Swiss-Prot record:
InterPro entries: Ribosomal_bL28 (IPR026569), Ribosomal_bL28/bL31-like_sf (IPR034704), Ribosomal_bL28_bact-type (IPR001383), Ribosomal_bL28_sf (IPR037147). Belongs to the bacterial ribosomal protein bL28 family. This is Large ribosomal subunit protein bL28. NCBIfam families: L28 (TIGR00009). It comes from Cytophaga hutchinsonii (strain ATCC 33406 / DSM 1761 / CIP 103989 / NBRC 15051 / NCIMB 9469 / D465). The gene is rpmB. The keyword Ribosomal protein applies. HAMAP family: Ribosomal_bL28. Keywords: Ribonucleoprotein, Ribosomal protein. GO terms for molecular function: structural constituent of ribosome. Pfam families: Ribosomal_L28. Residues 1-23 are annotated as: Disordered. The keyword Ribosomal protein applies.
Amino acid sequence: MARVCQITGKKTRTGNNVSHANNKTKRTFAPNIQKKRFFLSEENRWVTLKLSTKAIKTISSKGLSAVLEKATAAGYLKKY
C-alpha cells in the first residue's frame, strides 16, 4: 500500500520548492504516516492501521470504533 492514511485519506501531494531567487522546482509533500496497533474491544482483537499523526490524535479523542465506522463510510477503509 502507498503512503496513504487509512482514516483521513491523506496522501502524498506535489508542490514547489521556491528559492530566494523565486526559482521553482517540483517536490513532494509526504504525510507523516505511522503504523500503529489498536485493541478493538468490541471484537476482542488487535487492529493494525497505517495512520497520519492527525488520525492518531482523532482516535485518542473520539474513540477507535467511531473513527473506524466513519472511515469505512467515507470509503477510506475497506477492511480492518
